[in-house]
């Protein structure tokens, strides 16, 4: 049952998605009623957080069992003795899952209100406290120590510093103010610390602020799956083409036992800095970062210098991950998607430029994994159909592990080809929520199965380069 309204789109984007979910291939096989029901279910799921928090253990520094024990103790402390299990994923040996409790519908709302920006609100729904930069408005006389109710401005209409807000807002839970209104909106400049400590969130997830920072990395479940599918081996040379903020980069290095070379590129300097910070935090030494545009990463001719960075010569890498820039429609939670249709459709040509470079940089016999965190055909299955037609040297490969669904019909791919693709579709799970009683009555196998479905929307394709055609 929905707690929040369905995700909203601009009208032209809504029409685009509706047409996509009513394509002839889908309607012929499933019927228009089934596809309409599935589409509406997806819209509801996207506005709610995933049912589990996924944590990747840095097995370079600690064992899963050890971190699981420490994490269980930390959660008990945060939840004041409430017993929420920490589950080991049977097919992802470095991954822990924590069920999310919620939505909690019976929370009392307080007179003192705090309005936060949409992105801050989404972080709160996944376990974060409220930090000052995310606060847009507070009640006029709010003091440090006040009990407050926190709301998200999902349409981006609230002006910073407002004393009240009458626009569309969504209740996120209750907290205690760490600062007064005057301190938050001080003219001496914005603060960066915690503004509201959440004590009764609508969705109860652990906060990971400074919790085992060397041993844990928060990732969405499909993002962990991607690195396992690429399956890098010690001593290999790997390219992560669009690497920020470094979750997959550091995972690849960990899977290689920090032996070999992982080249991580991003074209934004601040994002490259974040990759470096994460590599240092997790104590990984085989990662080399470069601020560079992936579409220009192929060297036209051999260079005189011995520089190890981009551009690179053809066939320089054993394996390549292209986690491509995308429209991001699979991210959860998201209650109001603001991009225009022009912005949504701009990603396909960019992805093809990056993909073309990736194919040329990949050695014969090498593996290329392409992934996105979106739900559109144009950025996923259509890209696979284009790639197979454009590059005869590429063949689709089975994925291990394969815990998501198959590819979506509508791009002209065969059933055998669709089975080789992995599409994580949040609507595959029932939007039911979880309370502590139902959690304690659940079998671990059932919880794992639910976690495999109740995650973000995501797509993965795996290719092998067979020859130099």
Task: Describe the predicted segments one by one.
Residues 259-263:
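Short beta-strand element of Class I
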Residues 267-274, 337-363:
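Glycine-rich S-adenosyl-L-methionine
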Residues 70, 78, 84-85, 89, ...:
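C-terminal catalytic and target-recognition region of SAM-dependent MTase-like enzymes
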Residues 234, 258, 283-286, 316, ...:
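Short loop/turn motifs at secondary-structure junctions
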Residues 2-9, 50-52, 331-349:
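A mobile, often basic/glycine-rich helix-loop segment
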Residues 265-315:
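S-adenosyl-L-methionine
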Residues 151, 239-241, 265, 290, ...:
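The conserved SAM/SAH-binding core of class I Rossmann-like methyltransferase domains
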Residues 2-246, 250-255, 269, 273, ...:
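Glycine-rich nucleotide cofactor-binding entry segment
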